[in-house]
């Protein structure tokens, strides 16, 4: 599933091609995504793109009369292509631009979404979200304060979008390893020092992944069609049974909150 770094990589990749350009019209080949493609999108005509923003794992395309909200779901990706490039089986939505390019949305599993909002402040999918992990609002003091009396296990707790957005399964695993914190401890056991280290580590892991173009494990591609390269730097995620890159002990895997969790029992405590 594309997580925050992959969505931010997509945003940065499409921004130079869309901002200041005009969407002539949209082509919707299959509108049966997680939610039906918004009617406002299907009726787009000659709309100037003002900005491309991101909130959590949602891409926000600002137009004069509203916002296109895109979620990549489990297997979605966005590419900038020539208009004449034929669509393939899983290419469901195109935004046809005035300069002859298209923004093409590909989603084999169709769990993504193309929504519309006239007012982001009243948009239900963006309500009740926690702070952005790369913002100043997310820090060790915030994390330590929120962990007080929390019996939830640390890893599922980190993945709660009401606590902080965008720390998905890959990056929760990697951040906890780098911070030397066992993923199945109750959140309330975090010390103040650990909370500060964990907040700092989450920022560094996410930023490094963004710099490397995200993590491609299966379907994700950058806007130019290239994979993300952070997968080559993973310490624990997807490495059950392999030796730890730090100590050589075997990486273990358990289920927490119905999600696969990877850790090194020697390096994390």
UniProtKB/Swiss-Prot annotation:
Binding site for DNA: 90, 109, 150
Domain of life: Bacteria
Active-site residues, as the UniProt record annotates them: 2-3, 57, 259
Enzyme Commission no: 3.2.2.23, 4.2.99.18
Zinc finger regions, FPG-type: 235-269
SMART domains assigned to the protein according to its UniProt record, in alphabetical order: Fapy_DNA_glyco, H2TH
InterPro entries assigned: DNA_glyclase/AP_lyase_DNA-bd, DNA_glyclase_Znf_dom_DNA_BS, Formamido-pyr_DNA_Glyclase, FPG_cat, MutM-like_N-ter, Ribosomal_uS13-like_H2TH, Znf_DNA_glyclase/AP_lyase, Znf_FPG/IleRS
Catalytic activity: Hydrolysis of DNA containing ring-opened 7-methylguanine residues, releasing 2,6-diamino-4-hydroxy-5-(N-methyl)formamidopyrimidine; 2'-deoxyribonucleotide-(2'-deoxyribose 5'-phosphate)-2'-deoxyribonucleotide-DNA = a 3'-end 2'-deoxyribonucleotide-(2,3-dehydro-2,3-deoxyribose 5'-phosphate)-DNA + a 5'-end 5'-phospho-2'-deoxyribonucleoside-DNA + H(+)
GO terms classed as biological process: base-excision repair
Keywords: DNA damage, DNA repair, DNA-binding, Glycosidase, Hydrolase, Lyase, Metal-binding, Multifunctional enzyme, Zinc, Zinc-finger
Cofactor names: Zn(2+)
Intrachain disulfide bonds: none
A single MF term (Gene Ontology): 8-oxo-7,8-dihydroguanine DNA N-glycosylase activity
PROSITE patterns: FPG_CAT, ZF_FPG_1, ZF_FPG_2
Cofactor binding, note field: Binds 1 zinc ion per subunit.
Assembly with partners or alone: Monomer.
Protein family according to the UniProt entry: Belongs to the FPG family.
Purpose of the protein: Involved in base excision repair of DNA damaged by oxidation or by mutagenic agents. Acts as a DNA glycosylase that recognizes and removes damaged bases. Has a preference for oxidized purines, such as 7,8-dihydro-8-oxoguanine (8-oxoG). Has AP (apurinic/apyrimidinic) lyase activity and introduces nicks in the DNA strand. Cleaves the DNA backbone by beta-delta elimination to generate a single-strand break at the site of the removed base with both 3'- and 5'-phosphates.
UniProt-recorded name of the protein: Formamidopyrimidine-DNA glycosylase
């Amino acid at each position: 599933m594309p997580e925050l770094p992959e969505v931010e990589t997509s945003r940065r990749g499409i921004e130079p091609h869309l901002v200041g350009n005009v969407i002539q019209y949209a082509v919707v080949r299959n509108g049966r995504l997680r939610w039906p493609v918004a009617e406002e999108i299907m009726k787009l005509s000659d709309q100037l793109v003002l900005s491309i923003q991101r909130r959590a794992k949602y891409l926000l395309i600002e137009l004069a009369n509203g916002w296109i909200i895109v979620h990549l779901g489990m297997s979605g990706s966005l590419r900038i292509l020539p208009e004449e490039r034929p669509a393939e089986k899983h290419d469901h939505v195109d935004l046809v631009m005035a300069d002859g390019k298209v923004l093409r949305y590909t989603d084999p599993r169709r769990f993504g979404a193309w929504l519309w909002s006239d007012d982001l402040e009243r948009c239900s999918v963006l309500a009740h979200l926690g702070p952005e992990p790369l913002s100043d609002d997310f820090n060790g003091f915030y994390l330590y304060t929120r962990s007080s009396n929390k019996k939830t296990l640390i890893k599922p707790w980190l993945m709660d979008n009401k606590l902080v957005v965008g720390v998905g399964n890959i990056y929760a695993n990697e951040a906890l390893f780098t911070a030397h914190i066992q993923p199945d401890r109750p959140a309330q056991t975090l010390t103040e020092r650990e909370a500060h280290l964990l907040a700092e580590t989450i920022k560094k892991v996410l930023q490094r992944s963004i710099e490397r173009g995200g993590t491609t494990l299966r379907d994700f591609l950058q806007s130019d069609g290239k994979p993300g390269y952070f997968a080559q730097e993973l310490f624990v995620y997807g490495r059950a049974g392999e030796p730890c890159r730090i100590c050589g002990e075997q990486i273990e895997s358990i289920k927490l909150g119905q999600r696969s969790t990877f850790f090194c029992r020697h390096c994390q405590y």
